[in-house]
């Protein structure tokens, strides 16, 4: 077992928004209130027309300038001299926003496995509460990949009057059976750990083996065959451990020190519920209703959200444009080749100016 040290994870510049109003959740649950951890960069202009919302992935947080650092800087995708960039920790996470590790004010103890089921739409609703508290009613561009990309798409479907333009990356319009099966295998790995205790473990002490195993499984889908072959092949260390084994073990150990098992389960279940068509006329109609400018980034080597899923989005979203990132890094390419991704975002921003 290991203890989490949130002090080393959450930036000192993190701000917090709190709402004491009950939050009604899509699947019928309710939270008595919500706290949102967020960060901003740059200055909101007088017209409030320079807002960029960055949506993070599964184990990310509000510190976008850390996990997506190559996207920040003058002349880059997120330019603090021109843009007002906002990134918040999603509902259900463990980096400052209300989630399973939060104390339930009604019981006086951590929510743990009692945290209600949430969806991507609930995450977007909480982000909207935050932005409205900042006096923002229009977002120039919403950007995100993976779980972040799901939020981007739901922003367009839920609040088209606020969403000026969308750039979802490495994502589908509805979670596939392939992705759902991957998520469930990872959740079962956590549940198989004796320290899991049906989710009622000490919130400061992790079911280490299960969460690490879940992360190791996930890392096999975040990269790809070619990446593992080129990077590790059949190389072995002096102790006989294959380098590929050493790599995934290291990734598992790293996550255990910075994440929470109940949070992992909460967020992967929310991802499994991702479906733009749920409760709407149809999947096709929901995508067809997205009238704002949309650029979709597809990663050629992504085995988790393969190219055909982004091609489907492009086919169903009117006037959308499909871009390809041809890199041998797998799903995580959006985090690795930030030079190319930043350039693509900059080109989209320039096109938005021309079109306006």
Swiss-Prot record:
Which keywords does the record carry?
Acyltransferase, Amino-acid biosynthesis, Cytoplasm, Methionine biosynthesis, Transferase
Q: Which pathway is recorded for this entry?
A: Amino-acid biosynthesis; L-methionine biosynthesis via de novo pathway; O-acetyl-L-homoserine from L-homoserine: step 1/1
Residues binding substrate, per UniProt: 215, 332
Task: Name its cellular compartments.
Answer: Cytoplasm
Q: Where is the AB hydrolase-1 domain?
A: 50-335
EC number, as in UniProt:
2.3.1.31
MF annotations from Gene Ontology:
homoserine O-acetyltransferase activity
EC top class named in words: transferase
**InterPro entries found in the cross-reference section:** AB_hydrolase_1, AB_hydrolase_fold, HAT_MetX-like
**Domain of life of the source:** Bacteria
Q: Which GO terms describe its cellular component?
A: cytoplasm
**Which Pfam families does the entry mention?**
Abhydrolase_1
Predominantly, its location class is: cytoplasm
List of catalytic residues: 146 (nucleophile), 302, 331
BP term (GO), one: methionine biosynthetic process
Q: Which Gene3D superfamilies match?
A: alpha/beta hydrolase
Provide the catalytic activity annotation.
L-homoserine + acetyl-CoA = O-acetyl-L-homoserine + CoA
Outline what the protein does.
Transfers an acetyl group from acetyl-CoA to L-homoserine, forming acetyl-L-homoserine.
**NCBIfam families associated with the record:** homoserO_Ac_trn, PRK00175.1
Q: Which PANTHER family match?
A: HOMOSERINE O-ACETYLTRANSFERASE (PTHR32268:SF11)
- Its family? Belongs to the AB hydrolase superfamily. MetX family.
Quaternary form? Homodimer.
Q: What is this protein called?
A: Homoserine O-acetyltransferase
Q: Which species is this record about?
A: Chlorobaculum tepidum (strain ATCC 49652 / DSM 12025 / NBRC 103806 / TLS) (Chlorobium tepidum)
Lineage of producing organism:
Bacteria, Pseudomonadati, Chlorobiota, Chlorobiia, Chlorobiales
